[in-house]
């Protein structure tokens, strides 16, 4: 399964909202469709969002019918702004937008700028693929033979447009014949763990158990879990990390049980412009994601719902960051 593919100036994405029941690929024909796919989680995971954003901007730029920079620039800025507004938390999205904006700011010929934007999007895609492969290799070195590793949400190939970050670490350790196994949390409310991580672990042949989010502490107390590895959507300068809601709870539980808690993320997820997690904008999503399940209401009508998509794990709870440049241990 390929999450994202750029083919003949068309963006092909796998609709992740339908998995694992249906494997359906969508051909996106304009940047509005790309923006909508990001908003609705048809494409998701911080690195994949960044890649899709870059292609979406390239898409939009190719559709601008002018050869004059004075006419091209304001239309391009509208496209860039729409893509940037899709989701507020993932750093990779804004990294991609900034890189594409820089290409435009550096150009003087509209045709050449369009070509350069496509080239930059492809470059971002290849960089994320390569980064996830290196992350997986470095991270596998931390996993001891026979360990059971817990992961949360989905940080595999579907989320990274490549090999995977947190899930890539687990898969790489398995491929090294270390005899490891995994626990995957279902990840309410959108069940990325049950729908996506379970699918990827199954396809990779990794022995695993799917559990509800609230079971993690029980299995840690029983001594079943040896490490926790998660991905990230944005990492502040001090190491505070935003990731899927429920990550912070797992980090607290891991600390209480003496279990190392690792964050696997590419350098594109690190945001040096913000000092701490207090500065990270947390996306609030629709209440229907909690009150409905697969189109069926599961909660009473007319109730208040809180639905933050992410939480922030303080840096002091994280044993190490696994990046494409190596391992960064706490305090380094």
From Swiss-Prot:
SUPFAM superfamilies per UniProt: NagB/RpiA/CoA transferase-like
Pathway recorded for this protein: Amino-acid biosynthesis; L-methionine biosynthesis via salvage pathway; L-methionine from S-methyl-5-thio-alpha-D-ribose 1-phosphate: step 1/6
Site keyed Transition state stabilizer: positions: 153
Molecular-function GO terms, alphabetical: S-methyl-5-thioribose-1-phosphate isomerase activity
UniProt binding sites for substrate: 44-46, 87, 192, 243-244
GO term, biological process aspect, one: L-methionine salvage from methylthioadenosine
Superkingdom of origin: Bacteria
Its EC number(s): 5.3.1.23
Assigned keywords, A-Z: Amino-acid biosynthesis, Isomerase, Methionine biosynthesis
Enzyme class: isomerase
A Pfam family hit: IF-2B
Catalytically driven reaction(s): 5-(methylsulfanyl)-alpha-D-ribose 1-phosphate = 5-(methylsulfanyl)-D-ribulose 1-phosphate
Active site: 233 (proton donor)
Family, as annotated: Belongs to the eIF-2B alpha/beta/delta subunits family. MtnA subfamily.
NCBIfam families documented for this protein: eIF-2B_rel, PRK05720.1, salvage_mtnA
Function comment: Catalyzes the interconversion of methylthioribose-1-phosphate (MTR-1-P) into methylthioribulose-1-phosphate (MTRu-1-P).
Name this protein carries in UniProt: Methylthioribose-1-phosphate isomerase
The gene coding this protein: mtnA
């Amino acid at each position: 399964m390929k999450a994202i593919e750029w083919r003949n100036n068309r963006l092909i994405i796998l609709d992740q909202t339908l998995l694992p029941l249906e494997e359906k690929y969508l051909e996106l024909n304009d940047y509005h469709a790309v923006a909508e796919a990001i908003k609705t989680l048809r494409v998701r995971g911080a690195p994949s969002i960044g890649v899709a954003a870059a292609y979406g901007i390239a898409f939009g730029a190719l559709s601008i019918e002018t050869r004059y920079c004075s006419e091209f620039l304001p239309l391009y800025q509208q496209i860039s702004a729409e893509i940037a507004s899709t989701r507020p938390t993932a750093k990779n999205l804004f990294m991609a937008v900034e890189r594409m904006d820089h290409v435009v700011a550096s150009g003087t010929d509209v045709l050449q700028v369009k070509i350069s934007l496509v080239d930059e999007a492809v470059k971002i895609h290849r960089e994320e693929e390569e980064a996830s492969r290196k992350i997986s290799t470095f991270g596998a070195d931390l996993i001891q033979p026979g360990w059971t590793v817990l992961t949360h949400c989905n940080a595999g190939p579907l989320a990274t447009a490549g090999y995977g970050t947190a899930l890539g670490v687990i898969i790489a350790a398995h491929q090294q014949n270390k005899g490891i196994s995994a626990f995957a949390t279902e990840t309410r409310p959108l069940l990325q763990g049950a729908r996506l991580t379970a699918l990827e672990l199954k396809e990779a042949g990794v022995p695993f158990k799917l559990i509800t989010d609230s079971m993690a502490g029980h299995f840690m107390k029983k001594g079943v879990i040896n490490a926790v590895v998660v991905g990230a959507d944005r990492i502040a300068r001090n190491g505070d990390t935003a990731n899927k809601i429920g990550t912070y709870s797992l980090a607290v539980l891991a600390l209480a049980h003496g279990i190392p808690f690792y964050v696997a993320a590419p350098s594109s997820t690190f945001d040096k412009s913000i000092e701490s997690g207090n500065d990270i904008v947390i996306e609030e999503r629709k209440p229907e994601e909690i009150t409905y399940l697969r189109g069926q209401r599961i909660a009473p009508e007319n109730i208040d719902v809180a639905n933050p998509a992410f939480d922030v794990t303080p840096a002091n709870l994280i044993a190490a960051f696994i990046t494409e440049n190596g391992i960064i241990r706490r305090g380094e």
